[in-house]
């Protein structure tokens, strides 16, 4: 389960921001997770609670904003939405797609005290 390691990375980011911003408690963490990122949101929620137990993010709410996948079709030169890497272009049916979005996971915002 790589979500545990991802949550540990999130805590590192939160703690680094706490040092920079001089806050002592995190109330909410907003994450953007791309549809093509291979991150399971429910597994991430479970791991987040365990990993944050003894940190400044203990008890913090985890809000997940799911981002759609997108790609550029080399066949018809259009930007299209995709939900899986092997999807066909919704405009022309081509499988010659170059992924342009939806692969990332990032901390978007923190609510702190």
Swiss-Prot record:
Per UniProt, where does Ni(2+) bind?
2
Q: Which Pfam families match?
A: HypA
List GO molecular-function terms, semicolon-separated: nickel cation binding; zinc ion binding
| GO biological process terms on file | protein maturation; protein modification process
Q: What are the UniProt keywords, alphabetically?
A: Metal-binding, Nickel, Zinc
- Tell me the InterPro entries matching this sequence: Hydgase_Ni_incorp_HypA/HybF_CS, HypA/HybF
Q: Which residues bind Zn(2+)?
A: 73, 76, 89, 92
Disulphides = none
Give the protein family. Answer: Belongs to the HypA/HybF family.
Please explain the role this protein plays, according to its UniProt record.
Answer: Involved in the maturation of [NiFe] hydrogenases. Required for nickel insertion into the metal center of the hydrogenase.
Q: What protein is this chain from?
A: Hydrogenase maturation factor HypA
This chain's source organism reads: Bradyrhizobium sp. (strain ORS 278)
What lineage, starting at the top, does this entry show? Bacteria, Pseudomonadati, Pseudomonadota, Alphaproteobacteria, Hyphomicrobiales
């Amino acid at each position: 389960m790589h979500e545990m390691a991802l949550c540990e990375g999130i805590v590192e980011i939160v703690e680094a921001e706490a040092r920079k911003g001089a806050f002592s408690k995190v109330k909410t963490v907003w994450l953007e997770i791309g549809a093509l990122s291979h991150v399971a949101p429910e597994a991430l929620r479970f791991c987040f609670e365990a990993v944050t137990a003894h940190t400044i993010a203990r008890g913090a709410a985890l809000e997940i904003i799911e981002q759609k996948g997108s790609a550029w079709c080399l066949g018809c030169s259009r930007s299209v939405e995709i939900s899986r890497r092997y999807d066909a272009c919704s405009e022309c049916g081509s499988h010659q797609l170059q992924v342009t979005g939806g692969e990332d996971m990032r901390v978007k915002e923190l609510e702190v005290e």
